[in-house]
Amino acid sequence: MKYSKRYIAFTFILALIFVSNFYIYAKDSSTLGAFRGAQIDNTIWSPLVAADVNGTTIRLRIENKEYTSEDEHVYMDENRNIMVPVSMLRDALNSSAHVYNKNELLVEKHSLTADFKLADNNGFVQYKGQFYASLDKLSKLLDMTCSFDTATNTLTMTDKSEGVSTVPTKYDLRERQRVSLIRDQGSYGTCWAFAATSALESALMPEEQLLFSVDHMSMSNSFNVNQYDGGEYTMGMAYLAAWQGPVYDADDPYGDGVTRDDLAAVKHVQQMLIIDGKDYQGIKEAVFKYGGVQTSLYSTIASSKTKTPYYNKQTNSYCYMGQDKPNHDVVIIGWDDNYPKENFNVDLEGDGAFICQNSWGSSFGDNGVFYVSYYDTNVGTHNVVYTDIESADNYDNIYQSDLCGWVGKMGYDKEDMYGANIFTAQSAESLRASGFYATAADTSYK
């Protein structure tokens, strides 16, 4: 009996030693330990390491932003790559990240690109209906450092290109299949609704290619205006924030003078980003990361057939430098910092232009697209981009009172404010989210 106890104790000690050694080796994600001259097979060892890492919280520190596997579905695969949802890459890496044809991932940062085909050992996989990418493989292609701290289960990723612009000097969403169909507003004052729906469609591309109803946005909103009255970007924001739309164009086609109030929104817009006036870098980053940016111009052109001294028809280039306020909305779909100033009808200090999508049909400009100089008085003054668009079943209900959204602002020169709204629940429900407008950058809330 005494020997049995000794054997049991000895076995227990060996087990502790083995577990301790296993833990140490499992945390080593860069080498394989040899055991008495024998090399352990990587196909056996790596899954054990991954299982150990996935058994605890994985932490990510990416360019001063922090994430955990408790907040995002982050995991280590059987090849010891830290895998993150592709939906994280855009904001985590401050990059453009999109899936094409459900089998190809294109990530862009600075002037660098990382292109992956869907494959188990290629750094781009599909798991439980969601796409994932390897941070280690991305870092090697995007000039970033990537290290894994085994003691804290923390991956750290930093950009080696310090001081380099996030975006390239030239970018065109048409070349990335992220521009919606060119349409014609006709004689109606609906440019604001065309710009809003086009920007929304662009934000969903290339993963989804949808066509939303301009008729519904311009007629089934809460502003009690007709299609000849015109509008502005805040009206589109209010319509979308209230989940009054969007609806499909096929269900409420344009130009027939009637709309359908019985249609439900097919998408829920959960976040919109208002970009500060003349923040050209912010506009470029928004186009790069999210898609088309709705903006405003002053235009003396009423259609593709109208002539104006501010538009060079030969080069499809526009620049207005006066005091008149905006009266027309378009969508910024790209830029060219070196676009020649000589292409415009006015004398300019320097080169550079935004590439804009219009709503005057394909006969205007270059198949509906034209250039607007950086020196234009109004371009980039009022801007909005749609940054979070979810399926229409994300929530069961919405309670709201401000159906016209942001129509003005007032304040008391204070940094903090409190607000409240009271609604009567229709049944026993759980509050999952709340929405509001923040009219200043870097606003925090709780």
Which sequence ranges carry the predicted segments?
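Catalytic-core signature of thiol
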Residues: 159-432, 437-446
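Solvent-exposed amphipathic alpha-helical surface segments
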Residues: 19, 96, 145, 203-207
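Positively charged, low-complexity intrinsically disordered regions
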Residues: 7, 37, 62, 81, ...
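Sec-dependent N-terminal signal peptides of Gram-positive bacterial secreted proteins and lipoproteins
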Residues: 3-25
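Generic structural marker for isolated residues within well-ordered, non-membrane alpha-helices
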Residues: 13, 86, 135, 200, ...
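Compositionally biased regions
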Residues: 5, 21-22, 30-31, 96, ...
